[in-house]
Curated annotation (Swiss-Prot):
Belongs to the thioredoxin family. Residues 2-107 form the Thioredoxin domain. Participates in various redox reactions through the reversible oxidation of its active center dithiol to a disulfide and catalyzes dithiol-disulfide exchange reactions. This is Thioredoxin. NCBIfam families: thioredoxin (TIGR01068). It comes from Cyanidium caldarium (Red alga).
Amino acid sequence: MPSPIQVTDFSFEKEVVNSEKLVLVDFWAPWCGPCRMISPVIDELAQEYVEQVKIVKINTDENPSISAEYGIRSIPTLMLFKDGKRVDTVIGAVPKSTLTNALKKYL
Protein backbone atom coordinates (compact mmCIF):
# COMPACT_ATOMS: atom_id res chain seq x y z
CA MET A 1 0.00 0.00 0.00
CA PRO A 2 1.71 3.22 -1.15
CA SER A 3 2.06 5.98 1.37
CA PRO A 4 3.52 9.48 1.27
CA ILE A 5 7.31 9.76 1.41
CA GLN A 6 8.76 11.65 4.38
CA VAL A 7 11.24 14.26 3.13
CA THR A 8 13.65 16.58 4.92
CA ASP A 9 15.54 19.78 4.17
CA PHE A 10 18.29 17.51 2.83
CA SER A 11 16.19 15.19 0.63
CA PHE A 12 13.75 17.83 -0.69
CA GLU A 13 15.71 18.64 -3.84
CA LYS A 14 16.19 14.98 -4.77
CA GLU A 15 12.61 13.91 -4.03
CA VAL A 16 10.73 17.02 -5.20
CA VAL A 17 12.74 19.37 -7.40
CA ASN A 18 14.44 16.59 -9.38
CA SER A 19 11.35 14.38 -9.68
CA GLU A 20 10.13 13.44 -13.13
CA LYS A 21 6.59 13.02 -11.78
CA LEU A 22 4.16 15.65 -10.58
CA VAL A 23 4.79 16.07 -6.83
CA LEU A 24 2.30 17.00 -4.10
CA VAL A 25 4.11 18.30 -1.02
CA ASP A 26 2.25 18.36 2.31
CA PHE A 27 3.84 20.85 4.74
CA TRP A 28 2.60 19.79 8.18
CA ALA A 29 3.43 19.54 11.89
CA PRO A 30 2.48 16.90 14.48
CA TRP A 31 0.70 19.42 16.76
CA CYS A 32 -1.50 20.75 13.92
CA GLY A 33 -5.12 19.58 14.19
CA PRO A 34 -6.09 20.42 10.58
CA CYS A 35 -2.94 18.59 9.41
CA ARG A 36 -4.13 15.45 11.19
CA MET A 37 -7.60 15.89 9.67
CA ILE A 38 -6.26 16.01 6.11
CA SER A 39 -3.69 13.22 6.57
CA PRO A 40 -6.10 10.36 5.62
CA VAL A 41 -7.00 12.26 2.43
CA ILE A 42 -3.31 12.57 1.54
CA ASP A 43 -2.91 8.82 2.16
CA GLU A 44 -5.87 8.07 -0.16
CA LEU A 45 -4.40 10.25 -2.90
CA ALA A 46 -1.05 8.45 -2.55
CA GLN A 47 -2.85 5.19 -3.33
CA GLU A 48 -5.10 6.51 -6.10
CA TYR A 49 -2.38 8.37 -7.98
CA VAL A 50 0.56 6.04 -7.28
CA GLU A 51 1.52 5.85 -10.97
CA GLN A 52 1.16 9.55 -11.80
CA VAL A 53 1.98 11.59 -8.69
CA LYS A 54 4.68 11.43 -6.04
CA ILE A 55 3.25 12.50 -2.68
CA VAL A 56 5.61 13.68 0.03
CA LYS A 57 5.25 15.10 3.52
CA ILE A 58 7.62 17.51 5.23
CA ASN A 59 7.44 18.25 8.95
CA THR A 60 7.85 22.04 9.22
CA ASP A 61 9.11 21.86 12.82
CA GLU A 62 11.96 19.53 11.91
CA ASN A 63 12.74 21.12 8.52
CA PRO A 64 12.63 24.91 8.89
CA SER A 65 14.90 25.73 5.92
CA ILE A 66 12.60 24.43 3.17
CA SER A 67 9.56 25.82 5.00
CA ALA A 68 11.16 29.28 5.09
CA GLU A 69 12.34 29.03 1.48
CA TYR A 70 8.77 28.45 0.30
CA GLY A 71 7.24 31.02 2.66
CA ILE A 72 5.14 28.60 4.69
CA ARG A 73 3.11 30.74 7.10
CA SER A 74 0.24 28.41 7.93
CA ILE A 75 -0.23 24.67 7.83
CA PRO A 76 -1.32 22.48 6.30
CA THR A 77 0.00 23.97 3.08
CA LEU A 78 0.02 21.73 0.03
CA MET A 79 2.13 22.61 -2.99
CA LEU A 80 2.28 21.02 -6.41
CA PHE A 81 5.60 20.87 -8.23
CA LYS A 82 5.97 20.02 -11.90
CA ASP A 83 9.35 19.85 -13.62
CA GLY A 84 10.98 21.21 -10.47
CA LYS A 85 8.81 24.33 -10.28
CA ARG A 86 5.97 25.16 -7.90
CA VAL A 87 2.81 25.34 -10.00
CA ASP A 88 0.03 25.49 -7.40
CA THR A 89 -0.60 26.00 -3.68
CA VAL A 90 -3.55 24.97 -1.52
CA ILE A 91 -3.71 26.19 2.08
CA GLY A 92 -5.78 24.56 4.81
CA ALA A 93 -7.64 21.32 5.37
CA VAL A 94 -9.61 21.30 2.13
CA PRO A 95 -11.95 18.61 0.77
CA LYS A 96 -10.46 15.76 -1.24
CA SER A 97 -12.22 17.06 -4.36
CA THR A 98 -10.24 20.32 -4.16
CA LEU A 99 -6.95 18.41 -4.16
CA THR A 100 -8.10 16.01 -6.87
CA ASN A 101 -9.06 18.93 -9.12
CA ALA A 102 -5.68 20.59 -8.50
CA LEU A 103 -3.86 17.36 -9.41
CA LYS A 104 -5.90 16.83 -12.57
CA LYS A 105 -4.97 20.30 -13.85
CA TYR A 106 -1.33 19.28 -14.11
CA LEU A 107 -1.53 15.63 -15.17
